[in-house]
């Protein structure tokens, strides 16, 4: 009955109630976005596709863009992903993911994305100074991506490479990217 359901929701929470009593497949692990909200989100079709990159809006002058790579080995298992986010709105403007692209090519795709953002902004306003930042995970798989960035040269990728600051008291060698 409804009174029992309301009391049970209050006792165990909406997410657990929906998972246990309404048989919804909600993620149990902690996520950045609440799993109930994730289930309610609706997909949006891209406004255009450039290769395997899906664009949801056109980069604009006077906005800042963050391009983040989560690399993978590229052999058909785990997917590599690149998210393109407009700041300060945190609006997703584009994305790429693939599980057969090797790490060195993942960096080429990141490079093409940052160049596209830069060129698109400059086409709209030739006096603009595009604000583009990029980074990547630096775990074991990320090491190959970081080496590729070193091979290409950071100066050949539009934008500024962001990395974790060295934590006070840590003597560990500095590594580019984020853990």
Regions found by a protein language model. Give the residues of each.
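Gly/Thr-rich phosphate-binding beta-strand-loop-beta motif of the actin/hexokinase/Hsp70
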Residues: 59-87
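Functionally constrained cores in energy, signaling, and assembly domains
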Residues: 21-22, 29-32, 37-38, 42-45, ...
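ATPase catalytic-site recognition across NTP-hydrolyzing enzymes
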Residues: 1-69
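Mg2+-dependent endonuclease catalytic cores in nucleic-acid-processing enzymes, primarily RNase H-like
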Residues: 86-179
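C-terminal nuclease/phosphodiesterase catalytic domains that cleave nucleic-acid phosphodiester bonds
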Residues: 15, 20, 24, 28-32, ...
């Amino acid at each position: 009955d409804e009174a029992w359901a309301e009391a049970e929701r209050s006792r165990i929470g909406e997410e657990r109630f929906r998972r246990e009593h309404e048989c919804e497949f909600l993620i149990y692990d902690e996520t950045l976005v609440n799993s109930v909200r994730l289930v309610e989100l609706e997909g949006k079709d891209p406004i255009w596709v450039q290769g395997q990159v899906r664009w949801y809006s056109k980069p604009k002058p006077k906005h800042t863009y963050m391009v983040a790579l989560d690399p993978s080995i590229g052999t058909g298992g785990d997917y590599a992903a690149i998210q393109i986010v407009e700041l300060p709105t945190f609006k997703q403007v584009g994305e790429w993911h693939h599980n057969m692209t090797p790490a060195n090519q993942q960096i080429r795709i990141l490079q093409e994305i940052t160049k596209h953002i830069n060129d698109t902004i400059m086409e709209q306003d030739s006096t603009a100074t595009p604000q583009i930042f990029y980074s990547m995970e630096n775990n074991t798989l990320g090491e190959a991506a970081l080496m590729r960035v070193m091979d290409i040269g950071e100066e050949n990728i539009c934008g500024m490479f962001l990395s974790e600051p060295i934590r006070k008291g840590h003597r560990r060698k500095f590594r580019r990217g984020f853990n």
